[in-house]
């Protein structure tokens, strides 16, 4: 599953970073779903400031597991910007539910350009399966902001030199970084 950037700023399942994450997953023979959040393109509903969007992802996971029973093997979640923040909530809730049900959690969570902002729903704390990738020159969410957020959790961040928020001209390098994070 790969979650897209903020719907109110043009984020859709067709975003190039979302597609790059999805392609990295597909290259590892993982079934991938890139759903649009509510109110985006042909999706019903309206933006819900991160609350309903997490519900959207849960519904998509449920559909994916029912449609492709084999997905019960490896479960990878990815997200870009706002989608990465939503992915943190899925990962945290999945961990809580899976522990209670005696089921495995997500195998890997890839968070690219984590879109944390003081006026939005905060990102959830991360578990050990999460990997963060952030551009050194991110002009939307400063690297220092993400470092400050990750420090109390002692969570490492893979920093892509000279990369901005949208990784212009660096998608092949981003895909390589994602693949490294999937297998470290």
Where are these regions (language model features)?
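Serine-hydrolase catalytic machinery in alpha/beta-hydrolase-like enzymes
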Residues: 1-70
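Short glycine-rich catalytic loops that host catalytic nucleophiles or stabilize transition states
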Residues: 38, 158-164
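Catalytic histidine-centered segment of alpha/beta-hydrolase-like enzymes
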Residues: 45, 163-175
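Gly/Ala-rich beta-loop-alpha elbow adjacent to hydrolase catalytic centers
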Residues: 78-87
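Short beta-strand/loop motif that positions the catalytic acidic residue
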Residues: 126-127, 131-134, 138
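Short alpha-helix in the alpha/beta-hydrolase fold that links the catalytic acid
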Residues: 128, 141-150
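Acidic catalytic loop of the alpha/beta-hydrolase fold
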Residues: 136-141, 165-166
């Amino acid at each position: 599953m790969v979650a897209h950037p903020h719907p109110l700023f043009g984020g859709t399942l067709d975003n190039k970073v979302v597609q790059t994450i999805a392609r990295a997953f597909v290259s590892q023979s993982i079934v991938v779903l890139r759903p649009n959040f509510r109110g985006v393109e042909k999706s019903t509903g309206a933006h819900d400031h991160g609350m309903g969007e997490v519900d959207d992802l849960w519904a998509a996971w449920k559909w994916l597991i029912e449609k492709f029973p084999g997905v019960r093997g490896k479960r990878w979640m990815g997200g870009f910007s706002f989608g990465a923040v939503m992915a943190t909530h899925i990962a945290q809730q999945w961990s809580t539910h899976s522990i209670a049900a005696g089921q495995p959690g997500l195998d890997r969570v890839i968070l690219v350009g984590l879109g944390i902002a003081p006026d939005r729903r905060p990102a959830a704390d991360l578990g050990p399966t999460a990997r963060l990738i952030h551009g050194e020159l991110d002009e939307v969410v400063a690297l220092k902001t993400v470092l400050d957020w990750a420090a109390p959790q002692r969570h490492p961040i893979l920093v892509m030199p000279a990369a901005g928020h949208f990784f212009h001209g660096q998608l092949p390098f981003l895909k390589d970084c994602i693949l490294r994070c999937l297998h470290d």
